[in-house]
Amino acid sequence: MHLPRKSSFSLCNYRYMKFENTLAFARAMDKQDPLRKFRQRFYMPKLKGKEAIYLCGNSLGLQPKTVEKELLTELKDWRNLGVEGHLHGERPWLYYHHFFSKSIAKLTGAKEDEVVVMNQLTVNLNLMLISFYRPQGKRTKILMEAYEFPSDYYAVEQQVKLHGLDPKECIIEVLPREGEVTLRMEDVLQKIEQHKDELALVLFSAVNYYTGQLFDIKAMAATARKHGITIGIDLAHAIGNVPLKLHDWDVDFATWCSYKYLNSGPGGVSGVFVHRRHGNNPELPRLAGWWGNDEKTRFKMYKNFVPQTGAAGWQISNAPVLSMAAHKASLDIFDEAGINALRKKSETLTAYLYWLLQTDCGVNASHPTLNIITPTDKKQRGCQLSLQTKKNGKQLFDKLTAAGIIADWREPDVIRIAPVPLYNSFEDVFRFVQVVKSQL
């Protein structure tokens, strides 16, 4: 058995690792995993009374075992203190959003004043578009992926209409080349250059929800900024999955959800990033509400709105404390594990999945049933692999579910598999591939 030394594993340098298609190898890898203890911090779902192989953290992350404790803390303060919990609770609700800034800043590569936890993803995207899509003169257009998550497209389409413009004329889509599924970065950058005088905004997901492709946001932002074009990023499938450096990359704004890789529960609270150059500009147009007002004068009930400095100035209503309590439980785990360590494990875990599917199942472009459409390059993917089915895809997915696999089906023909480094193991990956092999 060709296992790396412990120090080698901690760097996850799988280029020099010889994978093996055995349960013993997978278990030995798990034994050497420095992050293995975190699996015990989550509840594992069951199917038919048996623990499932859960590979669906890209759709809904698992529940941290500390969620109940965090919720009970807030329920106890509500029960015992009533309205006084805003000032005298264990974590006073009046300042609740401040308790998340440090953790979220680390996950997004931001300054603490550049991030705030609030609302839901598409709500926040609409709030950001109000401020950052400012069509003027020739610059009226928005550049997007052709196959972006539909909710983002709905938001953009309606924002364009709010400005009295035609979405068919103002939305420029970047398409894969003929015969390809994913985008080439040179094509994205060329599209920005081609339309540099027409673009008011570049809006992209950091990781595509369908293919699992990770984009080079640094290069995209540099090209946009070179031409004075605003750039916004949807981090739904990136935050908690890959390291980010939004401030250094000079991204203008970003938003995300917390119920996927951040494991904060169904409908979990979202958040936004607003770069300091905008957060310190009180004149920037925005939709406003009392929770975004200067904290020092919020309860003076003045009519004039004075926004807080930073991303907090985009808040509208007070914090949803119970939802955010669940969010805190997960962020505490991320603080302990560290996103860079998680990424290193993830690269190896997903590489092992890729290798097993190819070597044990023969999955490739010429396979009669399955093909992996996620890029082979680790720099162009997070933990997700997307398996495109060529025939009877939903039937295969249902068979996997019946065999104890919880994965994700996306129309029209993709099974999404996401081995999450916080709670998935090499044994999970090995057993999953054995089930796939038995059904092909």
Predicted feature locations:
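Pyridoxal 5′-phosphate
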Residues: 11-440
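Polybasic, lysine-rich low-complexity intrinsically disordered segments
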Residues: 6-7
